[in-house]
């Protein structure tokens, strides 16, 4: 009863306000223009490096992505990716000792549980767009287990250089809010944590290192 009475009193109060509102105004049109850059790609590279990421270049038709990943992380032995371009045989072929080291490739789409990805050295994913103002990359959940984005020691993000926008306003206008994506995240360089003593620690909560491969 008390809840009902409170609700009625609230409605009565709001109705009185509506009755006594003599002048109404349309909602203002708010146009926010974010920062613009002469060269968005150059700014993205500079910002990515400033937040601790490494940036590498590759051509679109380059079949060397496995070699590029191995060049970036030659000591890695356990990889995770659901990208068809990432292949165990090619990762094995580009091991520093000529292919005698055992290399493991886990697929986040086929593991039974997310904790099976624990111990992953390098995760390779594809980003949807990059943002020049802060060096972040939007990564939608195109994999079953999104834990691969956070549980791996290092993260490699493949990004089309033509998909870099100026600012976050442009980014939110372009990201695909598709129901098939249950999750998405902006990642800007490696994980960073700072305490009250202003000590910056990288990799405490996610990847210790991030490499963005522009193609």
Please place each PLM-identified region on the residue numbering:
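The feature marks the mature, well-folded catalytic cores of soluble enzymes
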Residues: 2-215
């Amino acid at each position: 009863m008390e809840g009902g009475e409170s609700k009625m009193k609230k409605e009565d109060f709001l109705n009185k306000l509506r009755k006594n509102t003599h002048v109404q105004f349309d909602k203002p049109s708010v146009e926010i223009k974010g920062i613009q850059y002469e060269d968005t790609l150059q700014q993205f590279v500079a910002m990515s490096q400033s937040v601790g990421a490494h940036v590498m270049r590759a051509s679109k038709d380059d079949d060397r992505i496995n070699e590029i990943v191995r060049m970036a992380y030659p000591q890695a032995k356990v990889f995770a990716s659901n990208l068809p371009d990432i292949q165990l045989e090619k990762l094995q072929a580009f091991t520093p000792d000529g292919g005698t080291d055992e290399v493991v490739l886990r697929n986040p789409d086929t593991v039974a549980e997310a904790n099976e990805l624990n111990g992953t050295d390098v995760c390779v994913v594809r980003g949807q767009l990059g943002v020049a103002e802060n060096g972040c990359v939007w990564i939608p959940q195109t994999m079953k287990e999104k834990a691969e984005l956070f549980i791996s020691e290092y993260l490699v993000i493949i990004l089309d250089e033509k998909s870099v926008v100026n600012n976050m306003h442009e980014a939110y206008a372009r990201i695909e809010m598709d129901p098939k994506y249950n999750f998405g995240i902006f990642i800007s360089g490696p994980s960073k944590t700072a305490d009250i003593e202003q000590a910056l620690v990288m990799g405490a909560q996610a990847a210790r290192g991030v490499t963005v491969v522009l193609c």
